[in-house]
Amino acid sequence: MSSENVQRVPYAVSPPRYSVSHQMVTTAFEMPNYRIVQNLGVVRGIVVRSRNVFATLGATLQTIVGGNITVWTRLCEDTRRDAFDIMIQHATEVGANAVIGARYDTTELSAGVTEVLAYGTAVIVEPVNPGESYRS
């Protein structure tokens, strides 16, 4: 396959202008009151993060007293949100207005370095009742 036919997703970009709203992303494989009119394929958002030394020190101190380790919780939530936003951007770039079957996956690439992948199927949907309008 020539390099001209390969779609690339920019990962260092300014905030995207969405045509896929967060409300139009689901873990289900169908959307109530909508019909899928076109499947555009798999879309994904990948973020690779490492822990910083100061956060690791703070988390170590929190483990001594127990409870929720807020430093890691915040890092995990921020990373998942970023991967999700990149997935939505990718769906927008391929012309989708919804994503079905959304999932997350994580992989530890090396000590302290983790990849978070958000993925799903980009689709074009339309309301089942023609009088209703799609809201992005």
Predicted regions and their residues:
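Short, well-ordered alpha-helical segments
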Residues: V43, V48, T56-A102
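Positively charged, aromatic-enriched nucleic acid-contacting surfaces
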Residues: G112-T114
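Short, conserved loop-to-beta-strand elements that form functional interface hotspots
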Residues: A98-S110, S133-R135
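N-terminal presequence-like segments and the immediate start of the first folded domain
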Residues: M1-V53, V116-S136
